[in-house]
Amino acid sequence: MLSLNQEVHGPKTSEVYGFVGSISIVVATVIFLIWGYVPDKFLESIGIYYYPSKYWAMAMPMYSMVTLLVALVFYIGLNFMSTSKPTSLNTLFDDYSREDVNFLPLMKNGEDRPIDPISDIDITRINDLMFDSHLAK
Amino acid sequence: MAEPPKLRVLMVSDFFFPNFGGVENHIYYLSQCLLKLGHKVVVMTHAYGNRSGVRYMTGGLKVYYVPWRPFVMQTTFPTVYGTLPIVRTILRREKITVVHGHQAFSTLCHEALMHARTMGYKVVFTDHSLYGFADVGSIHMNKVLQFSLADIDQAICVSHTSKENTVLRSGLSPAKVFMIPNAVDTAMFKPASVRPSTDIITIVVISRLVYRKGADLLVEVIPEVCRLYPNVRFVVGGDGPKHVRLEEMREKHSLQDRVEMLGAVPHSRVRSVLVTGHIFLNSSLTEAFCIAILEAASCGLLTVSTRVGGVPEVLPDDMVVLAEPDPDDMVRAIEKAISILPTINPEEMHNRMKKLYSWQDVAKRTEIVYDRALKCSNRSLLERLMRFLSCGAWAGKLFCMVMILDYLLWRLLQLLQPDEDIEEAPDICLCHHRGVEVSEGLRKKIK
């Protein structure tokens, strides 16, 4: 019963929210632009005397943009700080390193073989494969 | 002497080991099968705690754990241009030919696809999830997807339902979207050699206990089924926020001896849990695809599932009993499943799954998509900007500005560090056959 009610009203609720949201944004934008651009004299002539200082019409957007830029710079700086040093052992081992486990060591011929489970290959072996000319052949 | 690799693929996603989930498994298994086909595969993801830097994993899979901090739910903070230098370096070092991004909710994936397209690489995108159209998060996500996919070469979805969803959300041409399902490693998920007796019918549930997976449905379904069938018991594997609700349900209906809660089940132990049961119950509220029911069917279990998203496409009708995501209908479906249980042959079901789904088949089909992407003609910046312009009255212009700036930044990077100055990483040839590895070991001893 509850789910049935939700199904009936759900789409309509979303549509109402969307409609009210878009109208509100348009109205808010118009009010903001009037506040920011119409001179004080005109506003006072039609009886509007009390509104926030026009300074904030410029300041708030600028503050927001600068905050966003600074947040980006901070985030990228944070990432550089979290980079391991070249001498750090975390570039070789970590909490999640897994040795290669050879389960099912006895495999019959023709029997399906599962895809190997995920595991790390030791860096010494990689170096041998990469740079030892004998093994490379 | 190893043959030169056919393709050099970069997989990009925020989600990879040591995280666990469907996307992580998909990337890993697909990579392994592509490696076996002779291609070179590199994975790019962000650092997970101390796991940072470059790792070589099973089969020679190279993984770049870029030191980029996750922001929310293992997704990095969107910086738009912040990843351009590292993406460029990786693409150049590994001589990548195709960039394959995974998951619509992965920030790193979208940024990498954008940068790769700017640099002229072929890009493929795989979408793993369904998203709605009406809530605030989905509206914003769909706009990002429209931007990210406006300029893409090919896309892959894991079910036809997922393809419809992605095409509607992103405005992508349906001709560019391929349907390649997930798969299951049938060699790992085999039925029990001796099937458990049906005197007591065991129903297995393995999923995260969250709202999206329908844990609230379980709270209502389990007591009702236990009341109707005294010989039924449940095994619930998985952990999550709804764990407490299920515990309360056990207490309330005195089902401690008939409902077993296992907690989190590592993927390597999933099979041993599945083979103890006769029926697998999936109560998801939304699914693009459902690997769990593939694994269950491969183990010979009859599946009962909600009829949501791409689930009806996954299994043949005689392997699954579908129900609406409603407790009463699910109870009826379980009743139907119990009635047809005697006709189920686990071994036969496993053999059919082996033919229907395999990661090797997925890799071959993905290979076709890569070849198709490589055949797409290169497009100049102006042509690409035209595509972005058509994304919307205001959004289109904004997208164009973003792409122009991306192009200029790329040129700046080329000025600061030319492509020729980036050192190329040497390749490794890792033998896949165990016998050869042994001989290598012997050779080392000889040295």
Curated annotation (Swiss-Prot), chain A:
Catalysed reactions, semicolon-separated: a 1,2-diacyl-sn-glycero-3-phospho-(1D-myo-inositol) + UDP-N-acetyl-alpha-D-glucosamine = a 6-(N-acetyl-alpha-D-glucosaminyl)-1-(1,2-diacyl-sn-glycero-3-phospho)-1D-myo-inositol + UDP + H(+)
Record's signal peptide: none
Pathway(s) the chain acts in: Glycolipid biosynthesis; glycosylphosphatidylinositol-anchor biosynthesis
Membrane topology: Multi-pass membrane protein
Keyword Transmembrane: yes
Cellular component GO terms held in the UniProt record: membrane
Organism domain of life: Eukaryota
One GO term (biological process): GPI anchor biosynthetic process
Protein localization: Membrane
One annotated GO molecular function: phosphatidylinositol N-acetylglucosaminyltransferase activity
Name of one Pfam family that matches: PIG-P
Transmembrane segments: 16-36, 58-78
InterPro entries: PIG-P, PIG-P_GPI19
EC identifiers of the protein: 2.4.1.198
Keywords associated with the record: Glycosyltransferase, GPI-anchor biosynthesis, Membrane, Transferase, Transmembrane, Transmembrane helix
Keyword Ligase carried by entry: no
Its biological purpose: Part of the complex catalyzing the transfer of N-acetylglucosamine from UDP-N-acetylglucosamine to phosphatidylinositol, the first step of GPI biosynthesis.
Family recorded in the similarity comment: Belongs to the PIGP family.
Protein name, per record: Phosphatidylinositol N-acetylglucosaminyltransferase subunit P
Record organism: Arabidopsis thaliana (Mouse-ear cress)
Curated annotation (Swiss-Prot), chain B:
Protein name, per record: Phosphatidylinositol N-acetylglucosaminyltransferase subunit A
Single GO MF descriptor: phosphatidylinositol N-acetylglucosaminyltransferase activity
InterPro entries: Glyco_trans_1, PIG-A/GPI3, PIGA_GPI_anchor_biosynthesis
Primary gene name: PIGA
CDD domains xref list: GT4_PIG-A-like
Places the protein is found: Endoplasmic reticulum membrane
Lipid bilayer topology: Single-pass membrane protein
Tissue-by-tissue expression: Expressed in roots, stems, leaves, flowers and pollen grains.
Native source species: Arabidopsis thaliana (Mouse-ear cress)
Keywords in alphabetical order: Endoplasmic reticulum, Glycosyltransferase, GPI-anchor biosynthesis, Membrane, Transferase, Transmembrane, Transmembrane helix
GO-annotated cellular components: glycosylphosphatidylinositol-N-acetylglucosaminyltransferase (GPI-GnT) complex
Record topological domains on the Cytoplasmic side: 1-387
Listed EC numbers: 2.4.1.198
Organism lineage: Eukaryota, Viridiplantae, Streptophyta, Embryophyta, Tracheophyta
Null mutant phenotype: Defective in pollen germination and pollen tube growth.
Pathway listed: Glycolipid biosynthesis; glycosylphosphatidylinositol-anchor biosynthesis
Record field: catalytic activity: a 1,2-diacyl-sn-glycero-3-phospho-(1D-myo-inositol) + UDP-N-acetyl-alpha-D-glucosamine = a 6-(N-acetyl-alpha-D-glucosaminyl)-1-(1,2-diacyl-sn-glycero-3-phospho)-1D-myo-inositol + UDP + H(+)
Known role: Necessary for the synthesis of N-acetylglucosaminyl-phosphatidylinositol, the very early intermediate in GPI-anchor biosynthesis. Required for pollen germination and pollen tube growth.
